[in-house]
Each structure stands twice: as structure tokens, then as C-alpha cells.
Amino acid sequence: GFQKGGKAAQWRDEDMAQLFLQKAKQFVVDNKERPFFLYYGLHQPHVPRVPNERFIGKSGMGPRGDVILEADWCVDEFLKELDRLGLAENTIVILTSDNGPVLDDGYKDQAVELVGKHRPAGPLRGWKTTMYDGGVRVPFMLRWPAMVKPGVSDAFVCQMDLLASFAGLLGQTY
């Protein structure tokens, strides 16, 4: 493929998750004294699904499972950083996705063969790229210890409402 940026734009795929985590943590450190917004988009489990060496073989589900473990580790490390900085209590953290799961995206990593009886979309029909519920219904987890008691809800959430919701929380119009 075509890539701009010369050597500065090149990295080892195995190091992407760690690099993005380090950048996210540094942003929080640099902005801890004032309100901030950070969009921290996890690369995993998108292709190339190449886990860091310390995650290879850990899931028993091949590279796809290993990078999902790596993504989980990254989220945990980021939350620990918020705790370490004393920011966790009053920081809103949302973990969500832009689409449902996909197993067979043409990337030959044994995802289909190793899935066993696990159903990534649960009982829903469809996957990413379909308009069925399995393709468009996504997880939405919110953590805000100062204001939201931990629990489970089956309430409908539309990501398009997030801008208006955050503006309202901040007393702003958009």
C-alpha cells in the first residue's frame, strides 16, 4: 500500500496497541489539571490482527482472541492510570463500538475455526456490514463513579445523542 510520512510513519504492528495506550496516558497526564476530552480508539481487533508477543497464544482462540485480550489489557491499564492520577472518580469513560462483530473478514487467522460454540453477536442475527441487529447493536459501557452507580441496563442508547448529552452536562449548547 501507499503510506506517507517516511520512516516516522512506520511501526511494528505488534507495538500499535502499546503505542496508542502510551499516547492516551500521556495526554491525560498533560491535561490532568483541566477538563479534557480524549477519543482513544483501540486498533484491536482490526486487521492486521497481530498481537504483541506477550499476548500470543494466551487466549486459545488464535490471533483474534489474543488481540481481544490485548485490547482488554489496554483498557485496564488506561483505567489504572486514571486511578493513579486521582481522576477516575469524576472522569466519564465510555467503551463502545461502531459496529457488531465479524469473524470472517478475509483475514486468515483461524477466527472461524476456533470460535467453537461462542457467538460473538449473542443471539442476534448478522455481523458487521449487515443491517441486522448483530451488525448494528453494539455494547455501550459507561463508567463515572461520582455520578453513576455500577449496574446493568437494557436501556436504548444512540451514540448520535452523545454530543447533546455531553453539551447538556457542561451547560453548553451545540
Q: What is each of the regions a protein language model found here?
A:
Residues 22-67, 102-104, 108-111:
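Active-site His/acidic residue clusters
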Residues 43-47, 99-102, 131, 146-148:
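Solvent-exposed loop/turn segments at secondary-structure junctions
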